[in-house]
From Swiss-Prot:
Top-level taxon of the source organism: Eukaryota
Protein name in the entry: DNA repair protein SWI5 homolog
GO CC list: nucleus; Swi5-Sfr1 complex
Pfam families the record matches: Swi5
Similarity section: Belongs to the SWI5/SAE3 family.
Gene: Swi5
Amino acid sequence: MIDENNDVSEEALSSDIKKLKEKHDMLDKEISQLIAEGYRVIELEKHISLLHEYNDIKDVSQMLLGKLAVTRGVTTKELYPDFDLNLND
C-alpha cells in the first residue's frame, strides 16, 4: 500500500513479492506441462508471434471495413458477405 507520502509498506511489498513468486511458479508448471506434451519453446514463440501478426492485420481490416461501411452508409456486418467474411470470426 502507498500512504500519503508515497511510501510503500513492507507488508505490501512482501505481499506483492509473494504473489509474483506464486505466478512465477504457476508459469513454470505450465511451461513444464507444455514441454511434456511435446511443445518446444521456439515453436510457442513463433506461434505467439504469428498470433500477434494476425491480430494486427485483423485490427486494420476491421478499421478499413468500418470506414467503407460509413462511406456506403451501411453497417460493417452488412459488408461481410461482400468479402466472403465469416460473422463469427
